[in-house]
């Protein structure tokens, strides 16, 4: 069966449940997705990340080791992680063990390991991660690009924290974050596998009964800078790491998403055959790869891309990126490029829906972005029927893509 979305009524809230039944393998997986509770909800840099990590430390009664042993003994996976917009708790188990999995999830939600030992453990882990990132020049270039594109906004912040912000986070900060952001009224359940609709409704109500009501906020739109800034960050490196981005004045709710899909594919999303790859690698040999994509989210839409090149050719590569985008916006694409995009995007569709996890992820995105289930299939039809004139009209209307900013990690 294909995925469905149903509402489970609980108190004053209709909890959306994205669901696909599959008895091919006797496994059940469930995601609890809490909206407006990811990195953008941080009151201190890294707070959402540490809050998720703390839920990986078991309960205060059992501690991390004993709780992990309970999970292992029953072959249950239970973890938490954060994205920009959401906080997610995932649980999966064999069907025969899923009741046990739900019981352990209940223990975790009712008794998180709010102890100083657990806090110090997750702080050590995060500080170690941040120390490693000091020599990850892709990370540094990406962070600097976000600072440029989203100046003075939550998107410009270091999501994973800084050593100073991580040290400043207290148990009380984490308690407040979890209690204010993990509620029944900002919950979306995504589930699939060998589980009936009735069982899923019962589990959803059980989980909801463990959660408070929280204040649900709408994500604010963030303006993307069009100032065409170039920032150089000097490090001990033999390569230049070039990250670039520009505004893309386009809503995630727009009805003609297929045009953006084709645009992205031809400009820099397709690897070999894309404009960027052809000009930077194939014709000039300046880099092993050059890519870009059009990112669309509830808070911002923008172009972002990256490449690596020799220090001596960084300015040439930067200039080519600008010229490729300028020419692309001015002239659009060719009939051959359009056909190549159609062939790949339509022809590779089976690979994007072959697993239950892929199908559930797609169904969740269709629901979350208000596109309706089945939107992706309709988009494929729109791609097949797209004309060269309408795609080029779309490309030429987005002159803001030329307002490119660069963050370049280069040698001292």
Question: How would you describe each model-predicted region?
Answer:
Residues 2-27:
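N- or domain-start disorder-to-order transition segments that initiate the globular core
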Residues 16-21, 176-179, 228-234, 394-395:
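Short, surface-exposed beta-strand/loop micro-motifs that present aromatic residues
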Residues 41-44, 99-101, 253-256, 314-317:
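Solvent-exposed, non-transmembrane alpha-helical starts
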Residues 69-215, 283-284, 289-412:
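Charge-rich, well-structured scaffold segments of protease-associated domains
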Residues 31-92, 271-286:
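M16/MPP (pitrilysin/insulinase) zinc-metallopeptidase core fold and M16-derived inactive scaffolds
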Residues 22-25, 31-36, 216-273:
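His/Glu-based metal-binding/catalytic segments typifying zinc-dependent metallopeptidases
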Residues 10-11, 23-26, 181-183, 235-237, ...:
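Extracellular/periplasmic catalytic domains that process cell-envelope and extracellular macromolecules
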């Amino acid at each position: 069966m294909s995925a469905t979305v149903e509402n489970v009524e609980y108190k004053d809230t209709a909890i959306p449940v994205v669901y696909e039944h599959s008895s091919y393998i006797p496994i059940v997986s469930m995601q609890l997705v809490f909206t407006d509770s990811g990195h953008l909800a941080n009151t201190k840099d890294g707070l959402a990340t540490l809050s998720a990590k703390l839920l990986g430390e078991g309960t205060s009664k059992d501690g991390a080791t004993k709780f992990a042993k309970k999970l292992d003994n029953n072959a249950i996976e239970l973890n938490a992680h954060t994205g920009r917009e959401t906080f997610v708790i995932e649980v999966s188990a064999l069907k025969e063990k899923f009741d046990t999995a739900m019981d352990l999830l209940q223990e975790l939600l009712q008794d998180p390991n709010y102890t100083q030992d657990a806090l110090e453990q997750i702080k050590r882990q995060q500080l170690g991660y941040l120390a490693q990132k000091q020599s990850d020049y892709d990370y540094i270039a990406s962070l600097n690009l976000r600072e440029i594109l989203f100046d003075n906004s939550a998107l410009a912040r270091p999501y994973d924290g800084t050593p100073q912000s991580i040290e400043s986070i207290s148990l009380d900060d984490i308690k407040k974050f979890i209690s204010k952001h993990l509620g029944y009224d900002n919950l979306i359940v995504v589930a699939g596998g060998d589980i009936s609709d009735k069982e899923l409704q019962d589990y959803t109500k059980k989980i909801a009964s463990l959660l408070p009501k929280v204040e649900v906020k709408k994500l604010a739109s963030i303006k993307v800078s069009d100032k065409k800034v170039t920032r150089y960050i000097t490090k001990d490196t033999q390569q230049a790491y070039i990250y670039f981005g520009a505004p893309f004045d386009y809503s995630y709710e727009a009805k003609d998403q297929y045009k953006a899909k084709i645009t992205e594919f031809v400009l820099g999303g397709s690897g070999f055959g894309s404009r960027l790859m052809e000009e930077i690698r194939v014709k000039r040999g300046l880099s092993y790869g050059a890519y870009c994509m059009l990112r669309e989210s509830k808070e911002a839409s923008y172009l972002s891309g990256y490449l690596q090149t020799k220090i001596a050719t960084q300015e040439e590569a930067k200039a080519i990126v600008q010229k490729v985008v300028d020419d692309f916006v001015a002239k659009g694409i060719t009939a051959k490029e359009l056909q190549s995009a159609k062939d790949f995007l339509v022809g590779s569709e089976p690979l994007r829906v072959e697993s239950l996890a892929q199908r559930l992820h797609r169904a969740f995105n269709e629901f979350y972005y208000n596109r309706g289930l089945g939107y992706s299939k309709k988009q494929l039809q729109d791609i097949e029927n797209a004309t060269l004139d309408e795609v080029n009209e779309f490309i030429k209307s987005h002159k803001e893509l030329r307002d490119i900013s660069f963050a370049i990690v280069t040698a001292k």
